[in-house]
Amino acid sequence: MVRHILGISGGKDSAALAIYMKDKYPDLKVDYYNSDTGCELEETEVLINRLESYLGGITRLRAAEGSPEPTPFEHFLKASGNFLPSPQARWCTQKMKLAEMEKFVGDEPTISYVGIRGDEEREGYVSTKPNIQAIFPFRKNIWSLDVINQFLSPKNAEKVRSIYLQVCPDNLVDPILKVLDTPLTRDFYYSKKLNALLDIDVKVFNKAVYEYLKTTDLPVGQLDEFPLIDNDDVLVKDDIFSILEDSGVGV
């Protein structure tokens, strides 16, 4: 059985994503969790507590249990030679968040929903374990980079072409095949091919990726159905604030 999880960082984007998922997909059983660093700001704790009431529960994860240091942050700060986390050494994310999430998941096939907005050009820090698949519901492209690279790889071209012919409406066959049959070059690389397919039809693209994933061991491919493939929402900063305010959780 495939698990669905969503990490609550205490930031606005992950909080809004949790509310969005609960409201838009009420039949999807999502395990919400928070990785406690022991050094959160008071307003962060207030937001998480309000969110917990709205969601009906958040599992609290805490790294470095049994450490003589008063908080997980101080434990890993000392272990790193008192070097604070930085863009080059993100031990806070790796040790206190990703590692704890991976322990929480274990070896179960799991879909992890990540709150990166549609107006952000980044992938975020996600697990590389093969049983954990990241999904980005706020973006036009909900799939992770590794999935896109597989899907658009020249070695899978015939398989993907065949899948598209199965899921594609007749009026979109020609423009989609034109994109698919255009070889990857320095001027027409993965991201351009991806955006060209998304611009034709997001939902058809998602259906094609989903059918492709059924031929792999990735978690989404193990599902009998995946409702997010019919979603073409793109949420940006203003939408995040609206979700938080309209829910009553607040910002």
Predicted regions and their residues:
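Nucleotide-activated chemistry modules centered on ATP-dependent adenylation/adenylyltransferase
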Residues: 1-251
